[in-house]
Amino acid sequence: MAATTTTTNAGRSMASWKRLSTLIAAFTLSWTSSFVAAAGSADYFVHDLPGAPDGPLVKMHAGHIEVTPDNNGNLFFWHFQNKHIANKQRTVIWLNGGPGCSSEDGALMEIGPYRLKDENTLVYNDGAWNEFANVLFVDNPVGTGFSYVDTNAYIHELTEMAANFVTFLERWFALFPEYEHDDLYIAGESYAGQHIPYIAQAILERNKNAGPVNRKWNLSGLLIGNGWVSPKEQYDAYLQFAYEKDIVKKGTDLANKLEIQQRICQKEIAVKPDKIDYPECEAILQDMLQLTAGGVGASGKNQCYNMYDVRLKDDYPSCGMAWPPDLKSVTPYLRKKEVIKALNINDNKSTGWTECNGQVGMNFNPKTKPSITLLPDILSAGVPILLFSGAEDLICNHLGTEALISNMEWNGGKGFELTPGTWAPRRDWTFEGEPAGFWQQARNLTYVLFYNSSHMVPFDYPRRTRDMLDRFMGVDISSIGGQPTDSRLDGEKLPETTVGGAAGNSTSNQAAEKAKLEMAKWEAYRKSGELVLVIVIVAAGVWGWFVWKERRKTAGQGYMGVATGERHSISNNPGPRGNLSGGGDRTRGQGLAGFRNKRSGRRDVEAQDFDESELDDLHLSKPEDPHADSRYSIGGASDDEEEQKPGKGSSSRQPGGRS
């Protein structure tokens, strides 16, 4: 018995030592991994940046991370640390489009901390997005910008791209574990409207299997600017946008030719509805740019519309491919040997930086469905999405974005409809005293239109887009002093934020802003007649109670209250209800869209009370207010558009590309 006890105790002791040794080994491995990761991250530190302005250099890291070892697939990143921490840590990932266009466009021409004054000189970007968030630019997919891969291994599918990106993030967080618990936002523009939802879906799937080793990532929101999301609505928007901007006049031979091509496009989409790109539809934009070209510019060449900003003209057939003007400095700057060295570019990257790699675009031939099919599930998973548009962009224009929102069903509703016949109000946005656009919001989706802006909204208005970002992220900077910016919706001053280099006052009262939004929604209900119905129901209930009491008095069964006077009869007619263009018609892309230019008042068409017979008396008219035609609410027929970028030498934007 004693021997048995001794043996048992010895066994337990041995088991305890095994457990302890396992814990020690795990701790040692963890410590070693952390040490290796820390040492590895130091290799990515950017010690200096040629041409940077005087003063402290923004803390940054850059370099390559291998994602597909079998074919040398490496993604390049450039990370900028936030200048301030406001109530929580946040990281914003930025992606440009193409497919195959470098995110260094975003870093040096849009939202990064620096912009190029010329090819040798950097200046601070007033409105950079790294004020209250770390910003991570990634050249995605492999082969784009500074990223590289074997020439026979370009990706073909969106799911493949997303898997590579998740691998990148896992290895990036292993190098920089201090950011893995950040609120994570994914932002970008143009063809990134396909990439971002697929990456988000892959992250959500990964999070389902998260554990002690694979930590859950705090995916907190998506921002897509002038995105290519839903081909059906966006191809259909080309011609509609051209009509509204007077690029093409209805009834002309040119209009008839383009309408024929549009019908060919629509037929192809009807037959094959799940594609992302259609040559028959790309031809609408190509033909439009060619057939509207005319006049001779300073270069002696015919002039065509800039497809990224229709207020501008360009030499045909460039039509915007050399735009924006900063691009002429970005390419030579990123090809400088000292810049390549500073950004820790691998020697395996044998070719110089190009804005858009045509090989990436030509090899990308996805069979996966357009990203519009993913948005409802992402929204229902609790991930907020913000879509924003520049009003002067042709290729991915705002009409198409508004149409795809109007036709999309998510979180128990369709489009921005709050209840049948009642639409979320469009709230006029002024920024520092100037009309900036409008905001519209419902069920976790936000839409922002920027007046007087192009395909690359942050290029035009970095300060306004920073204000948009901070509000979307719910930045609370109450602990930081400074002069706040003046940003208002419907004339009401918003919770205070800051843009540019100076810190702002406070955005702590996010609840107050939500309350204002609820008030605006209630105003929409009131205008549409919903409030009248509520009053009638309540009044009918009160009247019924008085009738019951009087009957009990007459029967001698009730108590005797205050002496009663005349009974008041309450009509059960709820009064006029805002029909909202025939109720469901607007949600099918019909209704009042043809009359959007008729509006001259401040109220939303969807929220106004009117008799349906008045539709017969409406006529098209051109508003004098340059913003009037931009304020109609989502829910009617509207279109958006996309772009192609023909070659322009070594940094060519390829046909069909949306950067």
From Swiss-Prot:
Q: Which UniProt keywords apply?
A: Apoptosis, Carboxypeptidase, Glycoprotein, Golgi apparatus, Hydrolase, Membrane, Protease, Signal, Transmembrane, Transmembrane helix
| Spans traversing the lipid bilayer | 528-548
Record keyword Iron present: no
User: Principal place where this protein is found?
Assistant: Golgi
A single MF term (Gene Ontology): serine-type carboxypeptidase activity
What are the boundaries of the signal sequence?
1-38
Family membership noted in the UniProt record: Belongs to the peptidase S10 family.
- The protein's name is Pheromone-processing carboxypeptidase kex1
Q: Which organism is it from?
A: Neurospora crassa (strain ATCC 24698 / 74-OR23-1A / CBS 708.71 / DSM 1257 / FGSC 987)
State the gene name recorded for this protein: kex1
